[in-house]
Regions:
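N-terminal signal peptide c-region/cleavage motif recognized by signal peptidases
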Residues: 18-19
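Non-catalytic cell-wall polysaccharide-engagement segments
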Residues: 392-434, 438-449, 519-621
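Extracellular/lumenal and peripheral-membrane lipid-interaction modules
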Residues: 23-400, 405
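Second-shell loop/turn segments in exported
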Residues: 26-27, 95-100, 111, 128-139, ...
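Bacterial N-terminal signal peptides that target proteins for export
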Residues: 1-9
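Export/targeting segments at the very N-terminus of extracytoplasmic proteins
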Residues: 422-496, 555, 559-560
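Short, surface-exposed glycine/acidic/tryptophan-bearing loops
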Residues: 498-522, 575
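Sec-exported extracytoplasmic/periplasmic mature domains
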Residues: 42-46, 50, 154, 158, ...
Length: 621
């Protein structure tokens, strides 16, 4: 099913709703590929074991014609169905078969491709057949086979019907449900007239021409007035964030659903789609003002474009026709929204919460879960969907953020002079509590930095215990984690603000020592743990870095491309900092100036860590 059979509806609807159209019959081609037709044949005709059909079978094993393994191709205006064939004609005598015919080979059925009388289906009508030699030439076989085919071939193979009624009806219902109340009449008129006008076959696909009557629209008067966009109010920004969160929730739900039928290798692509969407969401919220477009609509379109290729692959893997049909209808409905994007408000369609729910229900119709549920809890299924392991150990309970600087120093002064030893595989809980209640100053570095180094050693040790990363890369990974923590925060989890201890936070909302964004990583990590537990924050950062090192740096062969094993650390950090698709940013000539600078600064720190000078992080203070 590489070519979704309703994908071209997006073009149809886009043409129909374009401004200044006259009333006319608009025709648009739609393609059905052989995967989809074969799945329908397996569902309706070849229903026996191993996709087989048995004709004139007397149950003795001595008389039958078996057809199996249907394959479809199209050329020259016709469809050609090939099957494996096995024929026996004889009688059972004394537990054995006395056979007049015992034949095995291939059969090919030539079929006309026609529009059904309901104008919402196409027909594959069998007009002739032949037996084939292994080289594809016509074979001579007994007339018995021809007689049986004439007499016993089922109606569903003589005339196979491919119905468009269900997806067209679903599409009409979906668009009617998300249309503006002021545009319902025009939308209903156009979609209600949708029928199949003609069909042709060739090039491996059946091309169906859909047609629809388009109502005329008025001519615009003059040029549209160009007006400056007014600044958004706080309430408008809150509503925008709600809509953006709905798009995020929709794709999170969809990605989890799609992953259940996907191959493990698809998890990397699913992660890229979700991470790119969430990074764009964060960028929109950083600068929500002055956007003339609809950010929620743009966010949907960009994410949809990334998801569709994965949907196509997963659709091919569906085990039955109904689920394949569901995927194709889902893709078609989403593509219609995609096509309507450039028309904006004139189309009378918006990417609303209700519309996203309706779209999700096309793919998963019987799920009781709200597709737009937007929770902050760790979601084990989402972690699995994106190629991560089990959730991290829970964070340590956090204390009130307020503190008095003098009393704080007094409480812990003695411990700073007598720091406790910490083994790589064991962390003293008292040390963790101290770090989680400490806003270090420049004079504290002789004590603070060795303690954080112990935390990072422990985190690396724990991360490597899962044996996801082979031993030859362990040192590089350790240096990577230390250098990334240095680059991101100078090993700091907290800063002082208005006499309170608060998590270190960037302008884009990244938090803690590893600068992890809660909106980007929602559902994969405990958000409170990221804020208030330095160990949990470090674990999350190491978890992400290892994932990127395995799936991008090593998976893409960066060390082989450059001939340097340290490129694995540079690649993993580029993906960590810029998103998975930036895994090769550190060596790309076309990388942004900012990206080049960030990668150069990281590599400088990495080399210092590699040479045993990780405590040079003190220069930050």
């Amino acid at each position: 099913m590489r070519t979704p059979y309703l994908r071209e509806l997006l073009l149809l609807v886009g043409v129909l709703l374009a401004p200044n159209c006259l009333a006319e019959r608009v025709r648009v081609p739609v393609s059905l590929d052989h995967h989809f037709i074969e799945s329908l044949l397996r569902e309706q005709v070849f229903t026996g074991e191993q996709d087989s059909l048995r004709l004139n079978d007397d149950g003795s094993g001595c008389q039958y014609l078996a057809l199996s393994q249907p394959r479809v191709n199209t050329r020259g205006g016709r469809a050609f169905l090939r099957t494996r064939g096995e024929a026996r004609s004889g009688r059972a005598v004394g537990g054995r078969c006395l056979l007049l015919l015992d034949w095995r080979g291939e059969l090919e059925f030539t079929q006309e491709v026609l529009v059904g009388d309901d104008n919402k289906s196409i027909l594959l009508k069998t007009t002739s057949w032949r037996a084939l030699e292994p080289d594809g030439t016509t074979a001579v076989v007994s007339t018995t086979i021809g007689g049986w085919l004439e007499q016993f071939l089922p109606v569903t193979l003589k005339q196979t019907r491919i119905s468009f009624a269900q997806p067209i009806n679903q599409l009409e219902s979906f668009l009617a449900g998300i249309a503006s109340p002021n545009d319902m009449g025009g939308t209903s008129t156009m979609l209600g007239s949708l029928t199949i006008d003609s069909v042709s076959a060739g090039g491996g696909v059946a091309t169906v021409t859909l047609a629809m009557d388009v109502p005329s629209v008025g001519e615009p008067v003059g040029e549209p007035e160009q007006r400056a966009e007014s600044a958004l109010s706080g309430e408008e920004i809150a509503r925008l964030e709600e809509r953006l969160d709905a798009v995020d929730a929709f794709f999170t739900y969809t990605i989890k659903s799609v992953s259940r039928g996907a191959e493990p290798k698809d998890a990397t692509q699913l992660l890229e789609v979700l991470m790119q969407l969430r990074r764009e969401l964060v960028a929109i919220l950083i600068e929500p003002q002055g956007r003339a477009d609809d950010p929620a609509r743009s966010l949907f379109v960009d994410a949809w474009d990334g998801l569709v290729p994965i949907l196509q692959v997963v659709a091919e893997q569906q085990p039955d026709y109904e689920r394949a049909l569901r995927y194709l209808t889902f893709m078609s409905a989403g593509d219609v929204l995609r096509a309507l994007d450039h028309l904006g408000p004139a189309a009378g369609i918006e990417v609303s919460s209700d519309g996203l729910r309706r779209l999700a229900r096309i793919l998963i119709p019987d799920d009781a879960e709200d597709p737009l549920q937007h929770g902050d809890d760790v979601d084990p299924e989402l972690r699995k969907s994106l190629g991560f392991g089990a959730p991290l150990p829970p964070p340590q309970a956090f204390n009130d953020a307020s503190f008095n600087d003098a009393s704080f120093n007094h409480i812990f002064a003695m411990d700073w002079f007598f720091p406790r030893a910490v083994a790589a595989d064991v962390l003293d809980s008292a040390v963790v509590r101290k770090l989680n209640n400490w806003v270090p100053k420049s004079g504290d570095m002789d004590v603070y930095l060795p303690m954080v180094r112990d935390v990072l050693r422990h985190v690396v040790s724990e991360q490597l215990k899962a044996n996801e990363l082979t031993g030859e890369f362990h040192k590089v990974f350790r240096w990577l984690v230390f250098a990334a923590a240095w680059q991101e925060s100078c090993w700091r989890q907290f800063v002082a603000q208005n006499d309170k201890r608060v998590p270190m936070r960037s302008g884009s909302g990244d938090i803690g020592m590893m600068q992890i964004n809660p909106k980007v990583w929602r559902g994969l990590y405990d958000l409170q743990g990221l804020r208030w537990d330095i160990v949990y924050n470090a674990r999350a950062g190491a978890d992400i870095l290892e994932h990127h090192m395995i799936n991008y740096a090593i998976g893409k062969g960066e060390h082989q491309t450059t001939g340097a094993i340290d490129s694995l650390a540079r690649s993993a950090y580029a993906a960590y900092n810029g998103g998975p698709r930036q895994y090769n940013r550190y060596r790309r000539a076309d990388a942004s100036a900012r990206g080049k600078k960030v990668d150069a600064l990281f590599y400088d720190k990495y080399r210092q860590v590699r040479s045993g000078k990780e405590l040079a992080v003190a220069a930050c203070f």
